[in-house]
Amino acid sequence: MTIPLIDAATPVRVRFCPSPTGTPHVGLIRTALFNWAYARHTGGKLVFRVEDTDAARDSEESYQQLLDALNWMGIDWDEGVEVGGPHEPYRQSQRSEIYQDVIAKLRDGGFVYESYSTPDEIEARHKAAGRDPKLGYDGFDRDLSAEQIAAFKAEGREAALRLRMPDEDITFTDLVRGEITFKAGSVPDFAVVRPNGAPLYTLTNPVDDALMGITHVLRGEDILSSTPRQIALYRALHAVGVADYLPEFGHLPYVMGQGNKKLSKRDPESSLFLLLEWGFIKEGLLNYLALLGWSLSADEDIFTVEELVKAFDVHDVLGNPARFDVKKAESINGTHVRLLAPEDFRGRLVPYLQAAELVSAELTERQSAVLTEVAPLVQERIQLLAEAPAILRFLFVADDDVEPAEDALKGLPENLVEVLDAAITAVEPLTEWNAETIQDALRTALIDDLGLKPRLAFGSVRTAMSGRRISPPLFESMVILGKESSLARLRRFRDR
């Protein structure tokens, strides 16, 4: 039994079809990104449908989180939930009648058969024959007689439906891994409908792909073993008039965590929303996720979304597992932070400052002015937006609320009081309060007159201003604070 393949003239249609369970993780979003990038690269369509037939695990909260995650990442779709399209509905829970119609066609065509065996019975038969009891279904019900079926029904048993797997090798060319063959008999007949009549994922997923005209199935490596089943089902669907062609399959590499273990939902870096909380921006995270199995070139790690779309081809995806390296992700994110337009960067800081209760829900005139002045000073110094509140806190709090950190107190000169007195004496007479006059006055008083090294001289003043060992540029920070506040902080630190 054969089925046509797609050809170069077939318009590309890819899909993203998650289950709404848990919170979105980076492996899932990487899959969405690769499908989106391939659709945009080829001028094709991305279909977003939701596999929500598991009532016990699916939730509307998770569904909303999927939408939020994709929207935040800038991954849009051409057809699917929320936007509609010619193949509605796009939630499996609303497609029951469609599946029942296909099931009836498969039954009429003889491609599925009733299976009454329970898991315990299958295991017992394997044991009795000296086989591994975990081998899976043994084909017992494949050719039941009418009498046997009647007997099972008389017992009150309900039958699952299984697809007849062909007694031949199944070979396909994976877009990522090349030619793959599953030997005849290596994949048992599999259930497509539960005894209660509800279709299983093994049926609904390929049926939806067929009816929606999906041309390329790009998904995680963990689903590779199900491909021969889907190819066999596709052939049956073609025979009953449901499928026009067999799509191409591409299995994306595993995303590994620390210690070369597959990235788990329990790993903090796997949570997209936690990465957002840490201060990743979508441009940086999108860039890094694209590197988990693909690259623009051998020596080019930094690229824009436009460059990704222009270059992305699923045939270039690597089959080897990709490791999620948090440090590299942060470094790439920092590069994209520095590429932001100043006003854009300033705006993105606001939610993090609000979360830290450093600014009000509606910025005051003073808060807005401070942020405008300081944003360019920190844009070159942070990798994650969530670093900003700790660095900038001293600019938004009262002078009396600046408390020096322990690490900032270490290494200060023994004559700290003398240093601070000299600093106060140097800047108090200044009539022009700008970075240049402040720097000249402090350099003369602390380095030339007291003979201090710059680190000790300016480190003392920095700690007085910010309470930190590291801060935005010192003299510019003092300009933002103003003369009165700067002197108040020097005196307070001197008198502590």
Swiss-Prot record:
It comes from the Bacteria. The keyword Nucleotide-binding applies. Pfam families: Anticodon_2, tRNA-synt_1c. GO terms for biological process: glutamyl-tRNA aminoacylation. SUPFAM superfamilies: An anticodon-binding domain of class I aminoacyl-tRNA synthetases, Nucleotidylyl transferase. ATP binds at residue 265. A motif ('HIGH' region) lies at residues 18-28. Keywords: Aminoacyl-tRNA synthetase, ATP-binding, Cytoplasm, Ligase, Nucleotide-binding, Protein biosynthesis. One of its GO terms (molecular function) is glutamate-tRNA ligase activity. Its EC number is 6.1.1.17. GO terms for cellular component: cytosol. A motif ('KMSKS' region) lies at residues 262-266. It catalyses: tRNA(Glu) + L-glutamate + ATP = L-glutamyl-tRNA(Glu) + AMP + diphosphate. It is found in: Cytoplasm. Monomer. Catalyzes the attachment of glutamate to tRNA(Glu) in a two-step reaction: glutamate is first activated by ATP to form Glu-AMP and then transferred to the acceptor end of tRNA(Glu). Belongs to the class-I aminoacyl-tRNA synthetase family. Glutamate--tRNA ligase type 1 subfamily. NCBIfam families: gltX_bact. This is Glutamate--tRNA ligase. It comes from Renibacterium salmoninarum (strain ATCC 33209 / DSM 20767 / JCM 11484 / NBRC 15589 / NCIMB 2235).
